[in-house]
């Protein structure tokens, strides 16, 4: 499956406000990046959502700064634990809270990192490269970081950028 997405740094939205939005959901995510060939990103994820836990393995090959070919499958907890021993050297498990909501029929994902107090990362998938992203009025975009390697999840597992440089 080809995924086209855009990524932005935003001011952290008011938690109570976004919880009241249509189709809001919240999940705790732990991502671990694994050793792989250089053109491939290989990760496993533990996602806690509504009293359940789902484990997935994802292999992603970047096509360009906006799109990637992605293969994802659900795995067992045992497989997750076994694969986690192959963590890529120089990386750390990445923890974040993901809040999702729908606005004008479009799914928005806001990733909140414990290391940042005032900002978060917003991602949205697009149907095409030229699709224009319409933000809700309560989202304040600081800057777009689509294609900026410092803000890829794989890079953030090595070093989360200082919020002051945002």
What are these language model-derived features?
Residues 1-166:
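Phosphate-end processing signature that detects enzymes handling 5′-triphosphorylated RNA
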């Amino acid at each position: 499956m080809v995924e086209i997405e855009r990524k932005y740094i935003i001011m952290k939205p008011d938690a109570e406000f976004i919880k009241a939005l249509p189709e809001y959901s919240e999940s705790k995510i732990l991502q671990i990046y694994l050793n792989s060939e250089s053109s491939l990103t290989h990760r496993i994820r533990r996602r806690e959502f509504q009293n359940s836990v789902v484990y997935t393995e994802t292999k992603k090959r970047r096509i360009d700064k906006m799109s990637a070919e992605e293969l994802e499958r659900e795995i067992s907890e045992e497989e997750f634990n076994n694969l986690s021993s192959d963590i890529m050297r120089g990386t750390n498990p990445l923890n974040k809270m993901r809040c999702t909501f729908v606005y004008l029929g479009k799914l928005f994902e806001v990733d909140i990192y414990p290391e940042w107090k005032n900002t978060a990362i917003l991602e949205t998938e697009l149907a095409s490269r030229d699709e224009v992203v319409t933000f809700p009025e309560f989202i304040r975009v600081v800057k777009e970081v689509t294609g900026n390697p410092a803000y890829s999840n794989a890079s953030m597992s090595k070093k989360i950028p200082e919020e002051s440089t945002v």
